[in-house]
Amino acid sequence: MLTKFLPLLLLLLPGCALCNSDGSQSLHMLQISYFQDNHHVRHQGNASLGKLLTHTLEGPSQNVTILQLQPWQDPESWERTESGLQIYLTQFESLVKLVYRERKENVFFPLTVSCSLGCELPEEEEEGSEPHVFFDVAVNGSAFVSFRPKTAVWVSGSQEPSKAANFTLKQLNAYNRTRYELQEFLQDTCVEFLENHITTQNMKGSQTGRSYTSLVLGILMGCFIIAGVAVGIFMCTSGRRC
């Protein structure tokens, strides 16, 4: 089952190896959903603050384990965040199964959808440089679509986009939620968290917890955007060139 899933994860993870030597200078998030068929799906993901792994997500449907590896949220707050992530995963799977029932002749398994997003602050000596923010989506290991934060526009990951990619881009670029809210999350929420974390990284207490809580809520918003990407994929031959 995982012969295609795990190699893809390993291909995406080196992005974290490019994090700046200062562990607080970048935040990377990764989610991968592997659909063996209409009944079996396995999720895996993580969040890293520089070289520090902060969150992990792994497991088959109905038994996904989500962990925060750093004590930035109190138990009650983390329980709400974890519940939100579990709800998202359930809705994501339901969406795929719904489209499969409606377009069964166009859906081909296995299928792997991966999402990588985050932000990086420039080195201090790079005067005038702006933070680097990104949101990239791949299907079966190939670049599918990516987000241009400056213009809040989604673009194809290929010079010759398929009909599936064009359909997906049309959907993602049609709504404020998938454009300007994402732009705000990447350019403001994510970057401000890193800047605040650098200022308070030697301090312990609720300040960091509150900051990270708002970031996790932003991650949830990003996760729902992945569901929008899935709609485009499954509505047009499941990501195959068409």
UniProtKB/Swiss-Prot annotation:
Gene Ontology BP, a term: negative regulation of coagulation
Topological type in the membrane: Single-pass type I membrane protein
Signal peptide range in chain numbering: 1-17
Chain ranges on the Cytoplasmic side, renumbered to this chain: 236-242
Transmembrane intervals: 215-235
Source organism, top-level taxon: Eukaryota
Key words, A-Z: Blood coagulation, Disulfide bond, Glycoprotein, Hemostasis, Membrane, Receptor, Signal, Transmembrane, Transmembrane helix
Role description: Binds activated protein C. Enhances protein C activation by the thrombin-thrombomodulin complex; plays a role in the protein C pathway controlling blood coagulation.
Protein name as catalogued: Endothelial protein C receptor
Organism lineage string: Eukaryota, Metazoa, Chordata, Craniata, Vertebrata
